[in-house]
Structure formats: C-alpha cells, structure tokens
C-alpha cells in the first residue's frame, strides 16, 4: 500500500472525510470473530474503511456518507471466493462467466485456464486474461502447470518452465500463481522440469502453487507437500482430506457439476469444526444450468449447512479460508487486493442476504463497493470487447483439426477380459473392470484433434486401407465403457480433459461416426439413428460458447432431455460424464489416443 493510499484510507476510517457508502442496520457476519453481530460498514473507493458494532462502538458515532443503504436487519457477509475452477468448463467466456458468477455471490474466482491452454497454449491464456479484464468481479488467473497434463499427452500445446518465466516477464502481475500440479510422478521423482515449473511460481504475486493429488498418501504426500504445494481439491473421503490437512495443506471441498464431494467430506468438519479454518470451497467445473438454478459457492454453503456445518463456519470457508490459502487476507498491500472478511482495509466485496440458508440467490451483491447483482439478476457492467480480445477470439475459432475417418474405424469387436472403464456417477474417478462379455458395454473412442493425425495421413499413414485405420493406437484410441447407458445413438464432444481431443461414446459405429462429423469446430452433440438431435456449439477453442450463460443453459437443458430419452439416466450427467473419461491424471482407467490407460500404474491396459 502506498503512503498516499494509506493516508486516504486512514482519513476515511477516522471519519475525517465522507465515505461513499454506509451500510446500516446490518447483521454482520464476522468471520474473524465467528459470530453474527449488528452494526454498520463504511466503504470508500471500493474499500471497507470502517466497521462499527452496535453497543460496543456507539461512542464512536457514525460515518458521514454519500449514500446510506439500510440493510433492514439483513445479513451482511463477505463476498465468496471460488478456490479452484476452470471457467472454460462453464462453456462461456470469462466476461460472461463473471456476469453469471456475480449473481450467485462469487466476487473472486481463482481460475486455472489449463483447458484453453491445452488447445491454444499461452495465446489461449492471454485471451482469458484480456477478456477477464472486462469483468465486474475479480478473476485471479493461475498459470497452467501441466500443459499437457502428462508429458506424452497429445494436446495442442506445451508450456515449459521457460515459457512460464518468459510470460511472467512479459506480462508482470497478470498471472496470480501456479495452477494445479497434476504431474504426480514428476513431483515424486523430483523431475527437473517439474521442479522448475513449481519454482516459477516465485515470479507471481501470490507465489502459491495449487494442487491436485487424488488418493496420494504416505511418503508421496510428504513429498508433494514438501514441494510447497498449498492446497488440494481432489479428496473424496474424510481420511484422505485429513491426511492432507495434517501435512499443512488446505483442503478444498469440491461441489461442482460432475463432482459432489462436500457431503462425503463433511464428517471431518463435524467431528472437529476447528478444521474448517484450513478448508475452503471449490466448484472446479460448473455448468451454467446448475449455476443459474442452484448456485455456485453459495450452493456449497447450502450443502454444508444442510449436513450440519454452522452457517458462519460455512461462510468463513467460502471467504476467509480461501483468502488465507492464497495470501489475500493480510499484509500492507493495496487494499483492493485484500479480501475474505468484513474488516477495515479489505476490498468491499459484500453480500446482503435475506437469511443464512442459501436457498436462493443473494439479495444483493457488491464487488469493490459497486452493486453488481440483485435477487439473482445481474445489474452491473461488463466492459465492451476490445480489438485485442476480438482478434484472440477469432484465432480460437479454428481449433478442431480432425483426420479423415471411415466407418471401419468405429466398428471393432469386444475381446473377453479386456480392460473396461467403469463409470462412477457423480465422481471424477472411474473404475476398471474386465468382463467376459459385452453386455451393458458401449464403445468409446478418443480422436486426436490438434492436427497430428492430419499430418500423419498426409504422409500416407493409412496406406491403401480405409481412412483412419492407420491412426488407431497412435492418434485414435478405442475401447469400451460400462455404466454409460446411451442407446440407439452416440454422444460426442470436443471437450475431453485435459488435452481436449474428440471423445465419442455410442452403441453403434454409424452414429458414432456421424457424431464425430457433427462436432464441426466445437461442441457437444447427440446423434440418434443418423439424425443430429441436440447440439451445444462451442466455437471458442472447442470449449466455450460465444453466447450468454442463459443461452448455454437452455441448450444444456434441451441436450439433457434428449440424452435422457436415449437412455442416459441419472445420476450420470451425460456431458460431465463423457468429458472426464479421457482425463489421465485421476484414477483409475482412462482412454487416450493410444488406447486404454491405467492411471494407477501409468501403463496401458490390454
């Protein structure tokens, strides 16, 4: 904090100059004192400069203010911080994501844009950063640490430690920290490149490294924590979460669209509520249809409260704990950077709440003192798109480069005893089975879409055979999945974590081929009996729509109805279900362009 800013804040805090806004008659959610107490809050230039509690501070008088907002006994809570998310997984661009998130009380997002980086490299990250500048909320971008997710993944880009360092030097302050470190073997083996990437975080404002450590324990967990990785959002059982807490890590309880881990982890908190100080919330991946209807971090608060967590504790986890994890809660810094609590010297991210159940959207949401949402409706401003953002967006609209494919590629037989993916609805993890027959199974394929297959075909990879067969096992993976009950057709998507090759699941070769052809330059598609019955277009990198959150939500709802009619029954989410099947960093069995991959052994499974 500069001396000039400090003097301005102090003068306002002492009441020597009028404040901009005074919130009165509020029930203040005090996350430091772990209480709710009546009082008033003064804001100047987007910063909280004064908090006065009724009774205790009556002698201090009040503040002269340009605007007085009577909260009429409503609760006043700190704005929510999403500790880990991928904006691209909401299928909307950052400025649109911010508009949506603001309506549900998220005023800060810690965003890892490794989705677009896996498609378009650092140019993709630049698009996210520049588009995010238009947002009325604060988006803190983390440098993707694992592009690709594994060294031999067939992604659209590679970001090395040297690339990171050059980007930090060229764009100082634009990246907040290092995103989730998914290369577990690289950490455990002290791989020089992996260590250099972790060390690169020292060039960022936060100097923090986010984590990704599903089922990691013992000496491996010791090594992971010793590397300086501060947090993890992959725990699915209380014992796993407690292991990480005990090693000094923050645990993010994930409540998204695909993964719902919060309730499973809650016994750890209920057994000892003091643990909540080192726990926070993350959505990771949240579809607009879910975000708009049931919420984001506010939904995590609701779920936590429903399973028995005290509301003030839940709000603290949604704000202060996350701020502490990333070093955003203290220090003699620009007060616009400090957040996570209603306290002097913090950014004025504030929620006015009718109650503490989170059954509905916040009554009002303020970001840096400005009203941005009321009763679930966005009322703030999103800045116009700049020429730079428009140019970067145009470059992202030609990202799908698929090889020529014949029907023969999609028509293959099941081999008794071969490794099959077992879908686990509501979880990012999968199982592995070795059935003796194909009953209940569906074909699954992953087709590289970043141009490698196209280049190999140009060199004659297929010989005189049908188009694409020469790429099988190299750039086209084929296998089987159980629990993905699509019937009479196929589903395909250009989203396939994290390299985002084209994934297709179906019960017949013809519809699978038609679905792959239908994805075009990006999107989710459903094909039934040769007919395209539903589509969500995602032109930006094959990941994001150019439309609004409401547009995508409506398309998603239609897609879900059509998918249910094709036999994909709850609790399996057809979109979230398919897009995580290629993810090679979460156990157990995954599909890659080379074939079926056992994450637990890092070997290909026959």
Language-model features: locations:
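Active-site microenvironment of metallo-dependent hydrolases
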Residues: 1-39, 44, 102-104, 292-308, ...
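Active-site beta-loop-alpha junctions enriched in small/polar residues
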Residues: 86-88, 114-116, 144-149, 180-185, ...
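Solvent-exposed alpha-helices and their adjacent loops that cap or buttress functional pockets
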Residues: 14-16, 34-35, 61-63, 132-133, ...
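Divalent-metal coordination cores built from histidine and acidic residues
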Residues: 2-4, 9, 95-206, 533-535
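Short coil/turn connectors at secondary-structure junctions
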Residues: 17-19, 63-66, 72, 76, ...
